[in-house]
C-alpha cells in the first residue's frame, strides 16, 4: 500500500517524516498523471502545486483554518488529502467536480472558478473571524501569478492592508503562467524577483559556504534557510512591491521544497498579521510531456496517453474556435482596422493565429475583462475595430463596461463569445448561459448566434462592418457539426430551415439549437402538425419577419441554450405583443439555476431540452391540453384529425 492510500484527511500528514512527504509528493504526481489522463482535466496546474498544497495542509488546520483557492482548477491535490481519492469519474455527472465544491467536502469554501476573487473572499472571511471573536483561526488564500493581473486582487490587497490585526496568509503560486505565459508589468516584476542575480548569487553562495562543512553544514543550512530567505528578501529589495501596502513579504521560496515551504508558512502563521508567501513553482512539474508543451504546459487536457501525453482519440472534427481563428485572420488581412483583444486566453479563444501574423494588432491584457472592454472602446474611438474574444461566462464580469463604455458611446466593438451555452464538464461557473439574457437588454446592441461554420463566417464578417454599435457573435464549445442549409432566406436575413404546408407552429431556434428545432418539426409532422423552423441569425434586435411569421402561425416555440428567464424567447414574446399579435409563445431554454457538471447532452436532457420532450409538449399544446394552447384552427380549415394517444408517440 502506498502512502497516499493511507491519507483520509489532512491530519494524517502530521505523522509522516520528511522523507515520507517527498515520497507522497511523487505518488501524488503519479496518481494525477494516471487518473487525469483517463478523464481529462487540469493536469499541468495541479502537478505544479503538490508540495505547496501539502505544506499548507501540514501547517494549517483545515477546515478550522479556511483555505481558499483562486480559480480552483489547482485543487486536485487538496481533494486528495481531504479524503477524495476516487477520480474515476472526475468532471463527469455523479463524480468529483473539477473545482472545489461545498457539497463534496467541508474543506471546500469557494466554488467559483473565475479568477482574482480569492483575496476578496479571504478579506471577508478574516474580518468575519475577527468580528465573531474567532481570532485563533487563520485564512489562507492561494492565488496564481496570473490572477494577480486582475484588478480585483489589488482592490482586495488595498483593503487587507488597512487592518493589520488579521491572521491572513496569501500564498502566491508563481509559475509565470496563467493559461499561457503571464503578461504585463506584474509578470515582469515577479520574473525579476525570480531571476535577479543578487538574490540568486547570495543564495547559492551561502549554500556553498555551508556545504564546505559537509553533512553538519548541510544540516545547519537546512535549519537556517527560512531565515536566510527573509534576510535575502530584504537585501535584494524583493518586497518593494508590497512595502507601501504594509503587508509582510516572505520569499521567493522554492515551492517544490517541502521543508522550505513549511518553514515559510509556519513563520507566516505565527506572525499574526497579513503575510504574502511568494512560492516559485513549475507548471507540469515531474511530467515531461507537460514540460515540453510550450503553449500551456498541459493546462487542461482531454483523455491522453499517460506515457506520451498524446490524445488517445484525437478528434478530426472542426471546432467552433478553429473556424473563428481562421476567419478573423482572413478578415484582419483584408481590413487593417481590425484589432484583437483577449484576457489571458490567446489560444483558447482562437486569436493566436492573428497574433502570430500581426503581433502589433493583438493585445493580451491579462485576466482583466473590465479593462479589456473599456480599452476596446478607446480603440474604437481611435478609428479601429476591436474584436474582444472571451469565454461567454467571463463577459459577465464586464457588463458595466459593455453598457456604459461601449454601448453608451456607440462604439463599434465586436464581442466574440466562445463556450456559450452549456459547456459540460467544468460545471456551473463555466457554463456560458447568461450572455443572451444579460446582453440583449443593452441599447443598440446586435447579437448573433451562428448555427454552423458557414454562418459563423458570415455573421463575423457582418459584425466587424458595424462601427456605430456593439455587436456580439456567440458560439458553443466543441465541434461545429454539419452544415444546415436554409430552404430560403428572407429579405431581412432570416433563414427558413424547414416549412410545411400548414402553419401550426413557428419554431425559432438560436444558434446550434437549429438541429433540435428541425428534429422537433419532423416529429410534429409525423403527428399531422405543420411547423416552420427559422434561424434569425441575428437574434437581437428581433427581425421583423420573425414577428410577422408569429402572427401567421397558431403557436410560437423558441429554443435557446441560454437561461430562459429574460432570454431571446422573452424578447420575441414582447415584440409580438407590441405588434398586437396574441399568438401563444412557449419559451424553452435553461432554468435559472446553477447547472452541475456533466456532458452537454446529459445536461440538456436533465432540463428537458430534447426533441422528444419538446415535441410531446407541443402536441399537447396543439391539442389544447397544455398552456399556452395553440390558437384554434379557422372554422373552414380541413385537417386530418389527431388522436390524443398520438401524443405519446411524438
Curated annotation (Swiss-Prot):
Keywords: Isoprene biosynthesis, Magnesium, Metal-binding, Thiamine biosynthesis, Thiamine pyrophosphate, Transferase. Residues 633-644 have a biased composition (Basic and acidic residues). Pathway: Metabolic intermediate biosynthesis; 1-deoxy-D-xylulose 5-phosphate biosynthesis; 1-deoxy-D-xylulose 5-phosphate from D-glyceraldehyde 3-phosphate and pyruvate: step 1/1. One of its GO terms (biological process) is 1-deoxy-D-xylulose 5-phosphate biosynthetic process. Its cofactor is Mg(2+); thiamine diphosphate. One of its GO terms (cellular component) is cytosol. Mg(2+) binds at residues 145, 175. It holds the Pfam family Transket_pyr. It catalyses: D-glyceraldehyde 3-phosphate + pyruvate + H(+) = 1-deoxy-D-xylulose 5-phosphate + CO2. The keyword Protein transport does not apply. Its EC number is 2.2.1.7. Binds 1 Mg(2+) ion per subunit. GO terms for molecular function: 1-deoxy-D-xylulose-5-phosphate synthase activity; magnesium ion binding; thiamine pyrophosphate binding. Residues 629-650 are annotated as: Disordered. It comes from the Bacteria. Catalyzes the acyloin condensation reaction between C atoms 2 and 3 of pyruvate and glyceraldehyde 3-phosphate to yield 1-deoxy-D-xylulose-5-phosphate (DXP). Homodimer. NCBIfam families: dxs, PRK05444.2-2. This is 1-deoxy-D-xylulose-5-phosphate synthase.
Amino acid at each position: 500500500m502506498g502512502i497516499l492510500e493511507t491519507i483520509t484527511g489532512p491530519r494524517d500528514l502530521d505523522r509522516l517524516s520528511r522523507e515520507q512527504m517527498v515520497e507522497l509528493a511523487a505518488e501524488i504526481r503519479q496518481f494525477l498523471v494516471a487518473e487525469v489522463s483517463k478523464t481529462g482535466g487540469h493536469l499541468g496546474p495541479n502537478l505544479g502545486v503538490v508540495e505547496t498544497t501539502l505544506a499548507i495542509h501540514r501547517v494549517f488546520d483545515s477546515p478550522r483554518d479556511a483555505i481558499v483557492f483562486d480559480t480552483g482548477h489547482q485543487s486536485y491535490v487538496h481533494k486528495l488529502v481531504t479524503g477524495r481519492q476516487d477520480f474515476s469519474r472526475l468532471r463527469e455527472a455523479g463524480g468529483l467536480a473539477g473545482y472545489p465544491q461545498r457539497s463534496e467536502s467541508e474543506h471546500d469554501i469557494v466554488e467559483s472558478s473565475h479568477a482574482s476573487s480569492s483575496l476578496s473572499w479571504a478579506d471577508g472571511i478574516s474580518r468575519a473571524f475577527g468580528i465573531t471573536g474567532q481570532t485563533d483561526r487563520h485564512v489562507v488564500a492561494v492565488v496564481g501569478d496570473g490572477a494577480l493581473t486582475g484588478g480585483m486582487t489589488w482592490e482586495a490587497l488595498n483593503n487587507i492592508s488597512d487592518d493589520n490585526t488579521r491572521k491572513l496568509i496569501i500564498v502566491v503560486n508563481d509559475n509565470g503562467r496563467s493559461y499561457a505565459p503571464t503578461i504585463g508589468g506584474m509578470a515582469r516584476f515577479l520574473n525579476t524577483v525570480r531571476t535577479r542575480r543578487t538574490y540568486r548569487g547570495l543564495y547559492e553562495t551561502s549554500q556553498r559556504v555551508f556545504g564546505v562543512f559537509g553533512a553538519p553544514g548541510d544540516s545547519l543550512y537546512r535549519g537556517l534557510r527560512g531565515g536566510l530567505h527573509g534576510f535575502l528578501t530584504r537585501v535584494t529589495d524583493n518586497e518593494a512591491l508590497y512595502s507601501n501596502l504594509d503587508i509582510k513579504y516572505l520569499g521567493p521560496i522554492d515551492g517544490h521544497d517541502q521543508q522550505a515551504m513549511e518553514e515559510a508558512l509556519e513563520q507566516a502563521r505565527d506572525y499574526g498579521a497579513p503575510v504574502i508567501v511568494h512560492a516559485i513553482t513549475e507548471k507540469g512539474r515531474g511530467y515531461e510531456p507537460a514540460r515540453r508543451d510550450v503553449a500551456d504546459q498541459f493546462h487542461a487536457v482531454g483523455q491522453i496517453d499517460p506515457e506520451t501525453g498524446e490524445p488517445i482519440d484525437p478528434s478530426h472534427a472542426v471546432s467552433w474556435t478553429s473556424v473563428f481563428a481562421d476567419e478573423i485572420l482572413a478578415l484582419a488581412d483584408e481590413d487593417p482596422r481590425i484589432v484583437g483583444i483577449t484576457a489571458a486566453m490567446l489560444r483558447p479563444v482562437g486569436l493566436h493565429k492573428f497574433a502570430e501574423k500581426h503581433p502589433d494588432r493583438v493585445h493580451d491584457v491579462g485576466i482583466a475583462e473590465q479593462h479589456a472592454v473599456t480599452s476596446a472602446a478607446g480603440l474604437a474611438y481611435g478609428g479601429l475595430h476591436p474584436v474582444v474574444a472571451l469565454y461567454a461566462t467571463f463577459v459577465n464580469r464586464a457588463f458595466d463596461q459593455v453598457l456604459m463604455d461601449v454601448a453608451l458611446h456607440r462604439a463599434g466593438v465586436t464581442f466574440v463569445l466562445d463556450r456559450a451555452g452549456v459547456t459540460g464538464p467544468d460545471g456551473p461557473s463555466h457554463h456560458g448561459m447568461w450572455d443572451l439574457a444579460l446582453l440583449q437588454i443593452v441599447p443598440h446592441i446586435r447579437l448573433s448566434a451562428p448555427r454552423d461554420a458557414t454562418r459563423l463566417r458570415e455573421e463575423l464578417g457582418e459584425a466587424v462592418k458595424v462601427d456605430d454599435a456593439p455587436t456580439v457573435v456567440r458560439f458553443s464549445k466543441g465541434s461545429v457539426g454539419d452544415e444546415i442549409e436554409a430552404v430560403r432566406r428572407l429579405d431581412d436575413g432570416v433563414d427558413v430551415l424547414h416549412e410545411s404546408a400548414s402553419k401550426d407552429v413557428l419554431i425559432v431556434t438560436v444558434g446550434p439549437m437549429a438541429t433540435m428545432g428541425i428534429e422537433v418539426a419532423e416529429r410534429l409532422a409525423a403527428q399531422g402538425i405543420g411547423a416552420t423552423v427559422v434561424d434569425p441569425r441575428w437574434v437581437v434586435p428581433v427581425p421583423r419577419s420573425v414577428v410577422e411569421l408569429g402572427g401567421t402561425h397558431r403557436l410560437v416555440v423558441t429554443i435557446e441554450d441560454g437561461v430562459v428567464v429574460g432570454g431571446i424567447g422573452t424578447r420575441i414574446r414582447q415584440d409580438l405583443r407590441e405588434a398586437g399579435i396574441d399568438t401563444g409563445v412557449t419559451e424553452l431554454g435553461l432554468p435559472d439555476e446553477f447547472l452541475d457538471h456533466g456532458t452537454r447532452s446529459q445536461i440538456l436532457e436533465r432540463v428537458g431540452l430534447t426533441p422528444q420532450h419538446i415535441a410531446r409538449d407541443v402536441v399537447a399544446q396543439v391539442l389544447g391540453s397544455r398552456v399556452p394552447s395553440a390558437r384554434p384552427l379557422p372554422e373552414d380549415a380541413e385537417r386530418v384529425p389527431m388522436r390524443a394517444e398520438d401524443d405519446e408517440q411524438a
